[in-house]
Regions:
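Bacterial N-terminal signal peptides
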Residues: 13-23
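A general boundary/transition motif marking the beginning of the first structured unit of a protein
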Residues: 1-2, 177
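Low-complexity, acidic/polar, glycine-enriched regions of mature
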Residues: 28-196
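Bacterial N-terminal signal peptides that target proteins for export
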Residues: 3-14
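Short, charged low-complexity linear motifs
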Residues: 2, 18, 28-31
Length: 196
């Protein structure tokens, strides 16, 4: 009887160790990093003929990065901005920007950057293609970015991308013309992520 009891204990111990091993292995397979909303910034600039460029930023941003250490091609990152949180140097035109003529923020409250997947090795992300979604329209855009590992649990991602406002119907009617308010938009990001 002691032998059977000992076999049961060993069997349960082996089962317990396998479960712990599987759990620990899975927890290291995925790393999740969340955006630090207090210090991260997403800003933009649109050239204007014969006057000061339109410059602004989004105060309400969110997002995360998921690193899959087992299959590095399954890494993903998603970031969003609340269109209503836009702040610009031409403050008197803010309502116009939020209106259906430009962003139609009541119907399309978010702008989204989604990588789907990317390869990350040795703090390097080479040129990558993201999907930018504005006003329910998605376009693939190549970007370059730099990753700075500040501490073991804090990373900074910096870079810029360019898109055409005409691709997303940002500016319709008289505002569709790109003679005065140019078509090319520069989007800059300085994002800080902390490990969860």
């Amino acid at each position: 009887m002691h032998v059977d009891t000992l076999k049961k204990i060993i069997k349960n111990l082996v089962y317990f160790l396998l479960v712990i091993f599987f759990y620990v292995n899975q927890s290291y397979a995925n790393e999740r990093w969340r955006i630090d909303k207090d210090i991260s910034k997403i800003s933009f600039e649109v050239p204007v003929l014969f006057t000061t460029n339109v410059k602004g930023s989004f105060k309400d941003i969110d997002g995360f990065v998921q690193l899959d250490t087992k299959d590095r091609e399954k890494n993903k990152a998603i970031f969003s901005v609340s269109i209503n949180s836009i702040e610009i140097n031409y403050q008197k035109y803010k309502d116009l920007l939020l209106s259906p003529i430009f962003f139609n923020a009541s119907k399309y409250p978010l702008g989204v950057l989604d990588t789907k997947n990317f390869l990350y090795t040795n703090n390097e992300i080479s040129k990558l293609e993201i999907e930018l979604t504005i006003k329910n329209k998605t376009i693939k855009i190549p970007i370059n970015l730099k990753v700075n590992q500040l501490t073991q649990d804090l990373v900074q991602i910096k870079g810029k991308l360019f898109f055409l406002r005409s691709d997303f119907n940002i500016g319709i009617g008289n505002w569709k013309n790109t003679t005065i308010l140019k078509d090319r938009v520069e989007l800059n990001y300085d994002i800080f992520l902390f490990r969860e």
